[in-house]
């Protein structure tokens, strides 16, 4: 059954500026008067944030690809039950910094688990609750990783498990995101992130405005 709210997700490999664009879009939608539920993955709930710490901790080096995928979907199950579905039922616009496409890109392609196992888990956990619009921030992995490393230096923070992965890993993840976009062109829009922040945000706003206009008629 289709819920009354709308579900927008932002995706992309680390270093694309995704979180910056997410915050700007969130502020813009609120200015327009939309009731927005802002959330993220992994996380979004108390249980989900605990799982997030395990997943991103650089000391979790021995975690297997399958364990990583199952933990992602455990956090997602809690997130859907506590946050996403209730907000959609209230008629809100749900905006999530990553959702299930990240599992397909990172675990399906990056970890090479394949698409079948990710889809099987997704059917069980997400079912019919899928994003209505997904914006993928796209950038060459070599450039994105340099950006991410610069951010870590500015914040004096440790590299997380995913940011510490090889260039080849991030190339596979990017390939995954672009494959999803080719398979679902109506839902998934690719936004080139190799431009000034304001220019990227302008394109994102245009895409979202067109989407909202279609769905609010």
Residue spans for each PLM region:
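Hydrophobic anchor at the beta1->P-loop junction of P-loop NTPases
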Residues: 10
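Conserved lysine of the Walker
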Residues: 18
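NTP-dependent small-molecule kinase module
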Residues: 26, 142-217
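ATP-dependent small-molecule kinase phosphotransfer cores
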Residues: 32-126, 203
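Hydrophobic positions on the alpha1 helix immediately C-terminal to the Walker A/P-loop
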Residues: 21
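P-loop (Walker A) phosphate-binding loop of NTP-binding proteins
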Residues: 13
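A glycine- and Lys/Arg-enriched "phosphate-lid" helix/loop adjacent to the NTP-binding pocket
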Residues: 103-175
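Extreme N-terminal, non-catalytic leader segments
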Residues: 1-6
